[in-house]
């Protein structure tokens, strides 16, 4: 049963999930963009292997984060937000959760469709999710690539919204997700 009283700021665990996943997403984009520019060879394969490992790490963290979120209520949105702003904030968070699951899963399925292994930092290999299929690979690659741009856009929107709250609205939305800061409960 979730905690019924909303806190004034995010817990250290929620902050840890947020910032670790954010750092991994930035790393994922850097790895993917770097690998895209390379010809097929050892360097590209190493970058793609790391991309897959970090993707599976994001999937594991997303599961843990969702479980944490189900039992730990987040702070309420500021009272000064309009109905449309609250709806957009909630929709953005739901979309983030969906993408945190769908991006790694489509990447995993894409590798499975090519019968490429997905290992986790060379410690163990995940099983294939689907049978090899060139048409499935092409479809999953398109979906994965398209969703990566959606994730990029949503992340930029999320950052801009946090900065708007901090500098324009002058509320504590950003501070309550930052470690080592104090946020005031404002009415």
Where are the regions that the model predicts?
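Membrane-embedded alpha-helical bundles that constitute the cytochrome b-like, heme-associated redox core
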Residues: 1-187
């Amino acid at each position: 049963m979730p905690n019924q009283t909303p806190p004034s700021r995010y817990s250290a665990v929620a902050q840890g999930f947020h910032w670790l996943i954010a750092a991994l997403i930035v790393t994922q984009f850097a790895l993917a963009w770097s690998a895209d520019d390379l010809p097929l060879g050892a360097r590209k394969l190493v970058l793609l292997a790391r991309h897959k490992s970090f993707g599976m790490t994001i999937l594991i963290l997303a599961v843990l984060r969702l479980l944490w979120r189900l039992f730990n209520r987040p702070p309420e949105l500021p009272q000064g937000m309009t109905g449309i702003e609250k709806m957009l904030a909630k929709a953005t968070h739901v979309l983030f959760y969906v993408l945190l699951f769908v991006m790694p899963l489509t990447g995993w399925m894409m590798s499975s469709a090519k019968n490429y292994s997905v290992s986790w930092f060379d410690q163990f290999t995940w099983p294939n999710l689907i049978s090899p299929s060139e048409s499935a690979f092409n479809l999953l690659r398109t979906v994965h690539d398209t969703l990566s741009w959606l994730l990029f856009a949503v992340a930029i929107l999320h950052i801009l919204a946090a900065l708007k709250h901090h500098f324009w609205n002058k509320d504590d939305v950003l501070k309550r997700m930052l470690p080592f800061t104090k946020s005031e409960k404002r009415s």
